[in-house]
């Protein structure tokens, strides 16, 4: 194994069971009509920072298939890697790629990716298990891997969408004020809308977290960017999902209300007591869960304190694992969005679900064992 530590996908099953239990308990607390549809329950899986082969992703689907209204959100791109085939940036199986060890490898970047055939097979498999598979393409930030590929394979287009030289976020943020940048992202989405079609529900997550370093009072250019992509996805038969942390209070009235918000943190971090500039700006300018609900949005609870997990040496320590589970069960429910503040929204009527999120920052050289 080359001294790599191994974790099994089945280790997440216990966490999933606890999440589903907590959501079911919240049904009573929320005083919902029993005839209403139960909240969606799912997993968001980061396959960019930590790549998972298709056979492993199927095991997550198997785990989720035990629960009604379940979904698996694939975080397919981030700064570290574009984990799927993408002709728009020149990452394809028929050019600059080799198939080895059961996966495709980009010979330009030396990074693995799922082919479109892999993705279509996963969608078909998820559909057979009554699990909805949701694509997420991170934009307009967290795009370093995509920009690196574009710079190599289409330098003219790279120049058209990048931020001006000297901009601190040029390495991972496109200039979303430009029509060319919006068209570029739309083209990437268009590669995958046909592949994820034909499911019981059609969702597409467009990212939109951590745009620029600090939240701002208002951002009309971001509103235009998001609404344009939402309108495009609607015409393709999809409901748009996006992260919450750059939705400004001042802009609530002008965002399309059919966008569903996956809410992780108002302050853009995990420490509810943080007083740094980003947290302070978030409290001042970013809409809270309650404000989003009051404005007419539907929310999914992705609370970054309780439902975020980072597989790796620290997480799999028995005492850490036990504390995480016990804390989740004792202190979280569907109404609690803002980290471990204990603050609850007044009603969960438009809280349509929740997810555990598995991020790859700490996975390091951990390998994944197939069951």
Where are the language model's segments positioned?
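Sec-dependent signal peptide cleavage junction
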Residues: 19-31
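Catalytic domains of carbohydrate-active enzymes, especially glycoside hydrolases
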Residues: 56-80
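Active-site mouth loops of central-metabolism enzymes
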Residues: 42-56, 170-180, 364-367
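Hydrophobic faces of well-ordered beta-strands that scaffold small-molecule active sites
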Residues: 41-45, 70-74, 133-137, 204-206, ...
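Aromatic- and acidic-residue-enriched carbohydrate-binding clefts of CAZyme catalytic domains
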Residues: 34-39, 78-129, 143-179, 212
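Active-site neighborhood of glycoside hydrolase catalytic domains
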Residues: 172-259, 265-271, 276, 282-289
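Flexible, acidic glycine-rich loops studded with aromatic residues
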Residues: 63, 254-257, 268-371
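Bacterial N-terminal signal peptides that target proteins for export
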Residues: 2-11
């Amino acid at each position: 194994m080359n001294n790599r530590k191994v974790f099994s996908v089945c280790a997440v099953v216990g966490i999933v069971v606890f999440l589903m239990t907590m959501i079911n308990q919240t049904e009573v607390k929320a005083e919902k009509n029993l005839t209403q549809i139960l909240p969606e329950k799912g997993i968001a899986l980061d396959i960019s920072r930590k790549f998972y082969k298709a056979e492993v992703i199927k095991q997550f689907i198997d785990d989720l298939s035990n629960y009604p209204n379940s979904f698996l959100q694939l975080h397919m791109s981030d700064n570290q890697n574009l984990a799927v085939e993408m002709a728009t940036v020149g990452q394809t199986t028929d050019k600059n790629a080799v198939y080895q060890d059961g996966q495709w490898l980009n010979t330009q970047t030396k990074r693995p990716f799922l082919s479109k055939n892999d993705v279509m097979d996963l969608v078909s498999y998820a559909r057979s298990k009554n699990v909805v598979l949701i694509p997420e393409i991170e934009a307009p930030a967290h795009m370093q891997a995509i920009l690196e590929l574009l710079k190599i394979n289409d330098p003219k287009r790279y120049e058209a969408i990048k931020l001006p030289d000297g901009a601190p976020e040029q390495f991972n943020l496109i200039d979303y004020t430009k029509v060319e940048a919006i068209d570029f992202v739309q083209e990437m989405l268009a590669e995958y809308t046909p592949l994820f079609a034909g499911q019981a529900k059609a969702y597409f997550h467009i990212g939109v977290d951590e745009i620029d370093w600090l939240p701002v009072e208002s951002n009309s250019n971001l509103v235009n960017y998001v609404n344009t992509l939402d309108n495009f996805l609607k015409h393709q038969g999809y409901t748009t999902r996006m992260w919450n942390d750059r939705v400004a209070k001042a802009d609530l009235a002008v965002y399309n209300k059919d966008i569903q918000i996956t809410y992780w943190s108002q302050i853009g971090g995990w420490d509810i007591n943080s007083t740094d500039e980003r947290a302070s700006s978030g409290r001042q300018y970013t809409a809270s869960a309650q404000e989003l609900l009051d404005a007419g949005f539907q929310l999914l609870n992705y609370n970054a304190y309780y439902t975020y997990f980072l597989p790796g040496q620290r997480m799999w320590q028995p005492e850490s694992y036990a504390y995480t589970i016990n804390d989740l069960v004792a202190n979280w429910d569907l109404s609690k969005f803002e980290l471990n503040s204990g603050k609850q929204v007044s009603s969960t009527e438009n809280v349509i679900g929740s997810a555990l999120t598995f991020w790859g920052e700490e996975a390091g050289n951990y390998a994944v064992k197939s069951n």
